[in-house]
């Protein structure tokens, strides 16, 4: 049922039949276990007309499934499907008054659907097993979800994280957009964000890396629930994901629990990731801009492609 890639007494790397890559590091000097799921999909994989989608999906995967967070799924489901259809209509509507009417209807149906859901249940369940530091982040190439938990709750944690990926329901879609906009506005006031966007715009012109991960305001104002669902169905599959566990647990006792939980996830064919052209910049290119209150100097060098044997070494060198 597994293919082993690397192994020693404390570290094991292997793959389940469904393609999920598993990394286990047994470290009894740690007081608990740190658990991560990583999906090989980030902002570079989202449509250019729906920027911020990968990050928004990260937020929505805390909202539960048809079991977690569902007080009465039979009543919530038709309302949820109606909300999806209304967002499809909104995306095709250009008249301002007509859009306002559709948005009003989305509000009404969302309020009705909220009667049958508890969107914070996943977070509450993690907290209930002693989980701490529940969080996630979206990068250009990956999206990661993580928290720490007591080792004796290993099976429960694995069950919750695997269930999270089984029939997720993106409830409170409209309300969560306010949180994303708060984050967007916070970055607008952050000098380092302006600097990074300027630098990446120069280094990666014509590449998805030049886009800000959180997305453009015009796309955030026109959320596309159907595209978010399609993005999830395309990339969030076990053969495109990894499970990482580090800490005070027994590797051999944990393997059957992983098979029992994450082994149930169904693999699906993956599309090829879009390949963007990259152009190495010429020797000694220089740019300047007035972006903040303090002078800053950034120096960038041509590197190696993602996955190159020297990538990790360059990452370490960059941190020194």
What do the PLM-derived regions correspond to, one by one?
Residues 1-3:
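Bacterial N-terminal signal peptides
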Residues 46-48, 155-157, 174, 307-310:
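Solvent-exposed, non-transmembrane alpha-helical starts
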Residues 51-63, 315, 319:
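Active-site recognition of the HExxH zinc-binding catalytic motif
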Residues 5-45, 69-152, 186-240, 251, ...:
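Non-catalytic beta-strand/loop surface segments
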Residues 48, 60-72:
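Metal-associated gating/positioning segment near the N- to mid-region
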């Amino acid at each position: 049922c597994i293919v082993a890639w690397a192994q020693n007494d404390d570290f094991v790397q292997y793959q389940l039949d469904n393609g999920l890559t598993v990394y286990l590091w047994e470290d009894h000097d740690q007081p608990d276990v740190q658990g991560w799921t990583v999906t090989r999909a980030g902002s570079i994989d989202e449509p250019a007309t729906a920027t911020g989608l990968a990050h928004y999906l990260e937020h929505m995967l805390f909202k539960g499934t048809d079991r977690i967070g569902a007080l009465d799924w039979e009543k919530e489901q038709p309302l949820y499907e109606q909300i999806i259809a209304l967002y499809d209509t909104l995306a095709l509507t250009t008249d301002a008054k007509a859009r306002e009417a559709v948005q009003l209807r989305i509000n009404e149906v969302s309020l009705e659907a909220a009667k049958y859901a508890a969107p914070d249940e996943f977070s509450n369940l993690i907290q209930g097993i002693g989980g701490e530091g529940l969080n996630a982040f979206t990068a250009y190439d990956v999206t990661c979800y993580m928290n720490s938990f007591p080792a004796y709750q290993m099976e429960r944690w694995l069950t919750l994280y695997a269930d999270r990926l089984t029939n997720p329901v993106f409830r409170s879609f409209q309300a969560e957009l306010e949180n994303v906009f708060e984050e967007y506005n916070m970055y607008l006031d952050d000098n380092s964000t302006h600097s990074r966007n300027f630098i990446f715009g120069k280094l990666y012109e014509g590449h998805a890396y030049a886009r800000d991960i959180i997305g453009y305001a015009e796309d955030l104002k026109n959320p596309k629930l159907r595209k978010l669902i399609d993005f999830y169905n395309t990339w969030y599959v076990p053969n495109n994901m990894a499970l990482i566990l580090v800490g005070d647990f027994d590797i051999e006792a944990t393997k059957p629990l992983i098979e029992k939980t994450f082994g149930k996830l169904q693999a699906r064919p993956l599309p090829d990731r879009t390949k963007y052209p990259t152009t190495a910049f010429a020797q000694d290119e220089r740019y300047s801009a007035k972006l903040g209150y303090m002078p800053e100097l950034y120096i960038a060098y041509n590197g190696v492609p993602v996955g190159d044997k020297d990538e990790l070494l360059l990452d370490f060198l960059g941190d020194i």
